């Protein structure tokens, strides 16, 4: 169904999208909303790069399945997809984010602020990331179905 080259392009597209998006949005949240220093945020973002490389493809698969399920249950594909993107992003990223912040030595209050802020902002970010991910997939010529099927890359 998918050629090996198509799978590789899909993995690379998902990885580029995850690394770029999480670096930029994470740094903004950590500095502006969570009272982290630039150094703490930079440490967090640099640590997040290898983590995001590892989780990007599994997240892409997870997100595609959540979106496909939501679209199957909801005839209004735009709202269903947006809600699915929000749910997938928050439910997958929050535990990973806590682990990163613990690793860099953030204070519990900073972690709580950062994760809570991220969850609230994810009401927009998760949806925006879904569109950014699909944009990256198009850049890498990965087929993007308007109604994703439950398949693995």
UniProtKB/Swiss-Prot annotation:
Residue intervals passing through the bilayer: 11-31, 42-62, 86-106, 114-134
A single GO BP: amino acid export across plasma membrane
Location of the protein in the cell: Cell inner membrane
UniProt xrefs under InterPro entries: Ala_export_AlaE
A family per Pfam: AlaE
Alphabetized UniProt keyword annotations: Amino-acid transport, Cell inner membrane, Cell membrane, Membrane, Transmembrane, Transmembrane helix, Transport
UniProt membrane topology term: Multi-pass membrane protein
Gene Ontology CC: plasma membrane
GO molecular function per UniProt: L-amino acid efflux transmembrane transporter activity
Family in the record: Belongs to the AlaE exporter family.
Record function comment: Exports L-alanine.
Name of the protein in its database record: L-alanine exporter AlaE
């Amino acid at each position: 169904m998918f050629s090996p080259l198509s799978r590789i392009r899909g993995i690379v597209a998902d990885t580029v999208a995850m690394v770029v998006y999480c670096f930029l949005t994470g740094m903004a949240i950590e500095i502006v909303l969570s009272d982290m220093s630039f150094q703490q945020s930079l440490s967090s973002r640099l640590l997040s790069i290898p983590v995001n490389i590892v989780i990007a493809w599994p997240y892409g698969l997870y997100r595609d399945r959540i979106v496909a399920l939501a679209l199957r249950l909801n005839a209004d594909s735009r709202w269903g997809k947006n809600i699915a993107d929000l749910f997938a992003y928050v439910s997958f990223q929050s535990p990973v984010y806590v682990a990163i912040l613990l690793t860099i030595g953030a204070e519990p209050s900073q972690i709580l602020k950062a994760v809570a802020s991220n969850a609230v902002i994810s009401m927009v970010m998760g949806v925006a990331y879904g569109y950014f991910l699909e944009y990256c997939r198009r850049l890498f010529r990965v087929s993007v179905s308007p109604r994703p099927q439950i398949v693995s890359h």
